[in-house]
């Protein structure tokens, strides 16, 4: 599915470079293929939880005064990326690795490996 200016269409070659292209991913199949290839599944979570775990709110707080235009733009972007009704719950993050020790920051809380 593709989006251009908030309108859905099915041709990814229409307006190249300007479309947002969305794919529905079978993360269980990806995790299984990674495991079969000798990779470890390090974590699986929502985009929102991943960004919160990685400190997106701390980054936002460093943007400057909350009334500044830059802060307001950044806050809107964080809202769009993390809100459950926006991209926060719909988009997911899966990490595969080989030989990596220890937990990854992005999966410190809210890991959903059990859901795969």
Stretch-by-stretch model annotation:
Residues 1-116:
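Long, Lys/Arg- and hydrophobic-enriched amphipathic alpha-helices
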């Amino acid at each position: 599915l593709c989006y251009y200016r908030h309108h859905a269409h099915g041709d990814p070659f229409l307006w190249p470079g300007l479309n947002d292209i969305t794919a529905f991913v079978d993360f269980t199949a990806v995790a299984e293929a990674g495991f079969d290839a000798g990779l470890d599944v390090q974590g699986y979570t929502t985009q929102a939880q991943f960004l919160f775990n990685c400190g997106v709110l701390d980054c936002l707080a460093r943007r400057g005064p909350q009334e500044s235009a830059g802060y307001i733009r950044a806050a809107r972007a964080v809202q769009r990326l993390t809100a459950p009704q926006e991209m926060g719950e719909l988009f997911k993050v899966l990490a595969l690795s080989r030989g990596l020790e220890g937990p990854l920051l992005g999966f410190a809380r809210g890991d959903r490996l059990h859901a795969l």
